[in-house]
């Protein structure tokens, strides 16, 4: 049996799609030192190469890819989107605007100076900012008719040039951002690691190595005379056992009767107490605890330790600092804080926002009581609410179809903005109503990433046929423009953050990377700083930047 692979690929669009995806993802996993291409650029390069060999199919059939991607971006941003305009989020919003306004202005100017067309200028900006939403917003503006091209301009060539400009400039954008993140603090004779350590010391944040997470364990002790002398007749509230030991007294047996103590309890000799705490807290217990006989009793030790992810929902909690939660009063232990899928350093001054996820452990009833006070326990079901997902997707498309006329000019939102609005709404409602619109994070990530990669395959195959011609004519111009657009906005944002906002350099670098929505650079900077402190800044700008990048793509294609 003779199988002609070339013919098979040219005749089977679905097979071609997944072959390009598989090859691109394989290339994306290749690592040179600490440098990795990333899945989107790996798939795009593969698609351009396959397109140059003559493989193609109708890119319009792959519009579902970018529609799913932008809808999922909206869902992820929803819980934190509105909060970004409140509190200290205004600083982060300013940094995002500095990056975007300067990038759009420079892209417009360099595009005209180098004679780049609509597609190349906008694609170059998307790559220089390492921001796929720019590409998505521009393509949708063209497809929806929002951006009307002048007579004589080839629509298909503009679409092709979007992907070519993006592919040429992406590596410039990624490498320059990583280099600037390391170089700019050094020019001020500041060390990123020292800046991160300064914040950690000021705010009482442990390093990643110091915050190894364990489940609390239960041990029981019989109260002896030495412990009675130590308590000096004080009740549990006055003693503050947790403040001094890191453990909570969850249960007491007195005269054979088990009880859950309140703050008014006074320990008596012969009491048997069950302590809940991390292993290292038990190891550090005062000798007055350990000198009493340790008790191994099934009923006394029969406490159900639970670890749950609690989503912040309460209006009374959102906007408060972590220290104001007083978790010790609930007998609970905080293991992690996650915002916008980024693990945040556990710092007492961090301001909580709706949608934040607190990973909390402790006795089960107390964890659930805490969850009722501040929000709800994240659903662990793997079943998605597809009805809500599809309904809001439909609403997004309908929003995009709405048009308005001013005289002879007619324009509409387009699918990208419409789906962003509906996605943000679904994400916001999900953060406030736990049983509504639930989509497991893994499913959301897969849908978003697959949608993005399918979109990349479509534009890559479409543009690949003329890739050599584009590179020989405009390749060096695109690279030069990309360098300018990548570097100058970062420098401007750094100067604003350092000298106007007076931000800590570790937080500032993280915020700039978030404004560029560049996850790979964030990983490198965290490694360089030997801390997750920059993630605080990244989470502050990432959500709003993802949304405004899409709008910037639309604006750029309108200006070009």
Curated annotation (Swiss-Prot):
The chain crosses the membrane at residues 8-28, 37-57, 66-86, 94-114, 161-181, 386-406, 409-429, 451-471, 478-498, 539-559. InterPro entries: AAE_transporter, RCK_C, RCK_C_sf, Transp_YbjL_put, YidE_YbjL. Keywords: Cell membrane, Membrane, Repeat, Transmembrane, Transmembrane helix, Transport. Disulfide bonds: none annotated. Residues 203-292, 293-376 form the RCK C-terminal domain. HAMAP family: YbjL. This is Putative transport protein VF_0889. The lineage of its organism: Bacteria, Pseudomonadati, Pseudomonadota, Gammaproteobacteria, Vibrionales.
């Amino acid at each position: 049996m003779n199988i002609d692979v070339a013919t098979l690929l040219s005749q089977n669009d679905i097979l071609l799609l997944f072959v390009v995806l598989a090859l691109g993802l394989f290339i994306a996993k290749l690592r040179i030192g600490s440098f990795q291409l990333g899945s989107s650029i790996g798939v795009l390069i593969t698609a351009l190469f396959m397109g140059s060999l003559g493989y193609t199919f109708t890119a319009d059939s792959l519009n579902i890819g970018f529609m799913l991607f932008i809808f999922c971006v909206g869902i992820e941003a929803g819980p934190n989107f509105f909060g970004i305009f409140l509190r200290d989020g205004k600083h982060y919003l300013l940094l995002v605007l500095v990056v975007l306004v300067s990038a759009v202005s420079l892209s417009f100017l360099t595009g005209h100076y180098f004679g780049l067309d609509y597609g190349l200028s906008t694609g170059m900006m998307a790559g220089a900012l390492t921001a796929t939403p720019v590409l998505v917003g521009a393509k949708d503006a063209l497809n929806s008719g929002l951006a009307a091209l002048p007579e004589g301009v080839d629509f298909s060539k503009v679409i092709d040039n979007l992907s070519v400009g993006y592919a040429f400039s992406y590596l410039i954008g990624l490498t320059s951002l990583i280099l600037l993140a390391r170089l700019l603090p050094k020019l001020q004779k500041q060390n990123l690691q020292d800046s991160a350590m300064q914040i950690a010391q000021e705010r009482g944040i442990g390093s990643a190595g110091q915050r190894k997470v364990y489940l609390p364990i239960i041990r029981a002790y019989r109260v002896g005379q030495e412990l009675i002398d130590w308590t000096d007749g004080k009740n549990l509230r006055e003693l503050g056992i947790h403040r001094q030991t890191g453990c909570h007294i969850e249960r007491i047996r007195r005269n054979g009767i088990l009880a859950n103590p309140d703050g008014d309890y006074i320990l008596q000799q012969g009491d048997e107490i069950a302590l809940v705490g991390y292993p290292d807290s038990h190891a550090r217990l005062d000798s007055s605890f350990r000198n009493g006989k340790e008790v191994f009793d099934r009923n006394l030790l029969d406490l159900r330790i639970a670890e749950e992810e609690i989503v912040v929902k309460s209006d009374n909690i959102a906007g408060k600092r972590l220290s104001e939660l007083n978790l010790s009063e609930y007998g609970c232990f905080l293991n992690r804080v996650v915002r916008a899928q980024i693990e945040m350093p556990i710092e007492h001054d961090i301001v909580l926002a709706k949608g934040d996820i607190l990973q909390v452990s402790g006795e089960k009833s107390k964890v659930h009581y805490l969850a009722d006070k501040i929000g709800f326990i994240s659903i662990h079901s793997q079943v998605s609410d597809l009805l809500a997902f599809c309904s809001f997707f439909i609403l997004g498309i309908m929003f995009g179809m709405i048009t308005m006329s001013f005289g002879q000019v007619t324009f509409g939102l387009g699918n990208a903005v419409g789906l962003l609005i509906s996605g943000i709404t679904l994400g916001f409602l999900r953060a406030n109503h736990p049983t509504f619109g639930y989509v497991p994070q893994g499913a959301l990530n897969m849908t978003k990433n697959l949608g993005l990669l399918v979109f990349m395959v479509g534009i890559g195959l479409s543009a690949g046929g003329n890739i050599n011609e584009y590179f020989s004519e405009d390749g060096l111009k695109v690279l030069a423009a990309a360098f300018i657009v990548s570097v100058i906005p970062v420098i401007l944002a750094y100067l604003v953050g350092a000298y106007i906002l007076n931000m800590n350099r570790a937080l500032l670098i993280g915020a700039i990377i978030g404004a560029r929505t560049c996850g790979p650079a964030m990983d490198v900077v965290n490694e360089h700083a030997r801390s997750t402190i920059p993630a605080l800044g990244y989470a502050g700008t990432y959500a709003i930047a993802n949304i405004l990048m899409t709008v910037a793509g639309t604006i750029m294609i309108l200006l070009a």
